[in-house]
Amino acid sequence: MATNFSDIVKQGYVKMKSRKLGIYRRCWLVFRKSSSKGPQRLEKYPDEKSVCLRGCPKVTEISNVKCVTRLPKETKRQAVAIIFTDDSARTFTCDSELEAEEWYKTLSVECLGSRLNDISLGEPDLLAPGVQCEQTDRFNVFLLPCPNLDVYGECKLQITHENIYLWDIHNPRVKLVSWPLCSLRRYGRDAARFTFEAGRMCDAGEGLYTFQTQEGEQIYQRVHSATLAIAEQHKRVLLEMEKNVRLLNKGTEHYSYPCTPTTMLPRSAYWHHITGSQNIAEASSYAAQGPEQQVASQFLWAWSDTGRICASTVLLASLAVGVLSRGDIWLTPQVKIWF
């Protein structure tokens, strides 16, 4: 994990071709890789000082690249062209042939994956297609420091059908930490962050984990879809176990237990239900908060059903064998399960 991560891959003076007039104008060109601050892109500045002054550059997002090529010398000397899938192009010239070749190789590697893991251009790489495919499912995030982890900084976040993984930004094969989706208590996002609260089931321990990212909405939708799929799977298991309990208890009234289907509350309703007792205390404390804290308090959350359904499955398993663990599960008119 990189705490001093720099997204600048290459930079230098070039002459960029204007899209409107077709005139080559000298500028300072910065090529940035994708990170928590934004996607892979070219930034054009008037000069090198403008970068230090954090001026507003003209940005070209480098996505959907068809090819990177060198223009023939008779057409334009020391020129490099980026061709996009919509047949548009960005062309620039360099001060020397060596500089043009360096730009060409760098753009080929970063935009097309022509070289992975220090494999030279032109040599076949049997692992490259799989690695590239896996990379497309990872999001650029910056993990903020938290008490439970001794790592933080720029990294890659991956969401599978069962887990959330963090991968090292420099070595994509090094896994840093993981969280089972069924251990998430809640999760949410805003314009610049994705946050989730994990329970005690995960190796990293319970706590709140916050990531700075420009892809918060996409991450949220992936997590939301995966947790819904887990919830549906557990619900099917739950219904099957209820059916088996009825068959086992059929005709044995002495050992039968009331086993009504568990009510599946919507996420929003369930979140309101468990926080209803805290509304009075939170309302008084909210008024005393500053503007930034109030914005954080309005952060969009979604409650994860998976842990609740897992607990319901455990309850039915206990009913099936006629054993209940005192202190963990209480059978009352309104069943309460803590996890």
UniProtKB/Swiss-Prot annotation:
Residues 7-112 form the PH domain. CDD domains: PH_DOK4_DOK5_DOK6, PTB_DOK4_DOK5_DOK6. Phosphorylated on tyrosine residues in response to insulin, IGF1 or RET stimulation. The keyword Phosphoprotein applies. One of its GO terms (biological process) is cell surface receptor protein tyrosine kinase signaling pathway. Keywords: Phosphoprotein. The keyword tRNA-binding does not apply. GO terms for cellular component: cytoplasm. Residues 132-237 form the IRS-type PTB domain. InterPro entries: Docking_Protein_DOK (IPR050996), DOK4/5/6_PH (IPR037816), IRS_PTB (IPR002404), PH-like_dom_sf (IPR011993), PH_domain (IPR001849). PTB domain mediates receptor interaction. DOK proteins are enzymatically inert adaptor or scaffolding proteins. They provide a docking platform for the assembly of multimolecular signaling complexes. DOK4 functions in RET-mediated neurite outgrowth and plays a positive role in activation of the MAP kinase pathway. Putative link with downstream effectors of RET in neuronal differentiation. May be involved in the regulation of the immune response induced by T-cells. Belongs to the DOK family. Type B subfamily. This is Docking protein 4.
